[in-house]
Design a protein with these regions (language model features):
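C-terminal lobe and adjacent flexible extensions of AdoMet/dcAdoMet transferase-like proteins
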Residues: 131-238
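Conserved catalytic/acceptor-binding region of the Class I
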Residues: 56, 62, 77-181
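Short glycine-centered segments of the SAM/dcSAM-binding site in methyltransferase folds
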Residues: 9, 76-77
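Conserved NB-ARC/NACHT P-loop NTPase core of NLR-like innate immune receptors
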Residues: 1, 6-7, 13, 30-32, ...
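Class I SAM-dependent methyltransferase SAM/SAH-binding core
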Residues: 1-48, 62-66
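Short SAM/SAH-binding signature in class I
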Residues: 44-53, 79
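Conserved helix-to-beta-strand junction in the class I
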Residues: 4, 64-74, 127, 131
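Eukaryotic intrinsically disordered and solvent-exposed regulatory patches
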Residues: 14-17, 34-36, 51, 66, ...
Length: 238
């Protein structure tokens, strides 16, 4: 964004200092919590506000959209990109007992219990309209779980998403499963135990191993729905 719009000032926030050090001169990172009542900025400060993949981050994402409306200039735009946590399938290759589907269901339960819901994507458009945005638009895209698709573009996206899911699976799981659902660590992550008889695994130890196998199974044609919603703050407020 900073490279494409060199005359703009780009401000980004996060809860911790994990941002790269090498960024365009017009890009600035701040440690801040968007759920705070005051963004420490004057009203109508921004021309454009963008959010992406914040499912599970806030108790009320609709309130974040309301805040975005408040801090936008009249005529400014806000855009949100969120994926539905529950995977979909169009050809019945994803059974009800598919391990990754079960994993997402447990994650949803934990997120609701923690008052940080994951299922927000399908509510974005309504929240935008309720906040006062006009000309609200929505597009829904398919993001394959892995590279199962015959379409080259979707295959590439799926391969990238599979890598992301596999690399982040343990981290995604630990907080929800251990702190919220009270699973023990060995119920969450597998550890191979060596013995004179070879490698042996117990049921509780193979949980994430099975999830990883499910994610990489090309025979299951599953995908996430990605909702992209944007809207304009009216030039004049009634």
């Amino acid at each position: 964004m900073g490279d494409e719009f060199p005359d703009a000032e780009v401000q980004a926030t996060d809860l911790s200092p994990i941002q790269p050090s090498s960024v365009p001169e017009n890009v600035h990172f701040f440690i801040d919590d968007a759920s705070e009542d005051d963004w420490a900025l004057p009203p109508a400060h921004f021309d454009y506000i963008h959010t992406r993949v914040l499912l599970g981050c806030f108790a009320d994402f609709g309130d974040i959209i309301n805040k975005g409306f408040h801090y936008l200039q009249p005529g400014g735009y806000m855009e949100s990109q969120e994926l539905m946590s529950t995977p979909c399938c169009d050809d019945d290759t994803m059974g009800d007992e598919w391990p990754f589907l079960e994993w997402t269901e447990f994650g949803d339960q934990a997120a609701v219990k923690a008052t940080r819901p994951l299922k927000i994507a399908h509510k974005l458009k309504d929240w935008y309209e309720q906040a006062g945005f006009v000309d609200v638009q929505q597009k829904i895209f398919k993001l394959p779980i892995n590279a199962w698709s015959k379409d080259q573009h979707l295959k590439t996206l799926g391969a990238m998403w599979e890598e992301n899911l596999l690399s982040g699976l343990s981290g995604f799981s630990m907080a929800h499963y251990s702190r919220i659902l009270s699973w023990s660590k060995d119920q969450i992550e597998a550890s191979l135990l060596s013995s004179s008889a070879g490698i042996r695994l117990t049921y509780v130890q193979v949980y994430l191993v099975n999830i990883r196998k499910a994610i990489s199974d090309r025979n299951v044609h599953a995908y996430h729905k990605v909702h992209v919603v944007w809207g304009k703050k009216p030039e004049r407020l009634t």
